[in-house]
């Protein structure tokens, strides 16, 4: 519910923070996000005028603790309606009421590295940059400077390789949508596993599937 305040509803079932729910709102039925859960006496719930949640719509929690807390902070810091903040982080398909169940997601892709695509030696500059970057174990913004064709992408691919071997996830951003096919082709040649491409030209269902599979840990390279 994209408004500035929160509303109280009751439920007889266990609900966790960050879950989508369907609730009555005036004469309408809307999608809401559980922001806080409080336990009160069952007798009070039955006799109170608090409206009841119609249904819990998720098989999982949409917003886990780190993201949940970040969105609460963003709403307060930027003085923006808390409902709009949470809504903006949901795929469009989850912002609407639907009778369809959440699509099933296959098991995690098994990523294998194709050595045939990297049968060449790195330059001394590439080796130095890669060695330094591999030592970084936490968030650290780093700029790799080089002219076009100097081999920056290969450094990125070697780093992706390292993270995939460590069972971690990788998010790769490209400056414009026209570069997606080129990067996707490079990644598919290097890794035998599903690569998720998420952009505005996909249908809502396609974007949702990639979002959900990434969210559940089944997609390691996006």
Functional labels for PLM-detected ranges:
Residues 1-222:
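Accessory, non-ATPase domains that flank or precede helicase/AAA+ motor cores in DNA-metabolism machines
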């Amino acid at each position: 519910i994209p408004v500035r305040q929160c509303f109280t509803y009751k439920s007889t079932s266990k609900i966790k923070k960050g879950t989508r729910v369907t609730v009555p709102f005036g004469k309408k039925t809307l999608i809401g996000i559980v922001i806080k859960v409080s336990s009160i006496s069952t007798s009070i719930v039955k006799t109170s005028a608090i409206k009841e949640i119609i249904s819990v719509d998720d098989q999982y929690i949409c917003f886990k603790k780190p993201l949940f807390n970040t969105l609460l902070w963003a709403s307060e810091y930027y003085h923006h309606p808390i409902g709009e903040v949470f809504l903006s982080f949901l795929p469009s398909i989850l912002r609407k009421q639907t009778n369809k169940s959440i699509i099933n997601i296959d098991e995690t892709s098994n990523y294998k590295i194709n050595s045939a695509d990297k049968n060449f030696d790195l330059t001394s500059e590439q080796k130095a940059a890669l060695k330094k970057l591999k030592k970084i174990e936490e968030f650290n913004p780093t700029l790799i400077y080089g002219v076009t064709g100097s081999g920056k992408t290969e450094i990125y691919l070697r780093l992706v390789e390292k993270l995939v071997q460590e069972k971690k996830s990788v998010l790769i951003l490209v400056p414009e949508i026209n570069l997606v096919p080129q990067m996707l082709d490079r990644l598919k040649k290097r890794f035998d596993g599903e690569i998720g491409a998420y952009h505005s030209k996909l249908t809502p269902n396609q974007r949702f599937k990639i979002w959900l599979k990434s969210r559940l840990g089944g997609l390691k390279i996006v």
